[in-house]
């Protein structure tokens, strides 16, 4: 079963092709042009390098958010377009869970993905990796820096951070409350998206292109501004 996965929810753009949960190829870009300019060309190069046609894909997986509003929309629209052509199933994956999956190996640990939500906030969630299993400890949320710091201190153990909010998170927590994470594990990986999607597919958790919905956690700035004007 071939799985195509993509993540464009932050600065990093990543696409991957898997056979079940085995990685065949992954391309990642951490800078340069916008995702609207790079995601489709990256996908074309990925598939061509593996001599695979888009119509051969069985499952389309996407990091559904939270993250950059524009990036989330681009990823969802790309996958919806591909899946709609041949009525293939779609699977949406939490960006934060995919980030945590990057660190789901080795010894038991607490993993906290942090993404820049602006306005003094992170998009974040907490996960435990215990006895070879990644366990979600709370829902995805938008959380102020102050509340984030308070909750991590209350955990009573040092944590591993990942995501584009890594530097800000480490600055808040310092070495007292957090470990250093290798740089290559801090960023989005479409392979992590595919791994989660494969498990969800086996559990019967899938949807159609029409039903796939991004996760924003809060309204885009333009929509918030519009509502404020309406109240006024």
How would you label these PLM feature ranges?
Residues 22, 89-187, 216, 221-222:
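Surface "functional belts" at beta-alpha junctions
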Residues 30-38, 69-73, 77, 94, ...:
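Residues at secondary-structure transition points
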Residues 1-64, 142, 187:
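N-terminal beta-alpha supersecondary unit
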Residues 46-50, 85, 103, 190-201:
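Stable alpha-helical structural segments in soluble proteins, enriched in small hydrophobic residues
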Residues 181-232:
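Acyltransferase
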Residues 62-95:
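DPxDG-like acidic metal-binding loop motif
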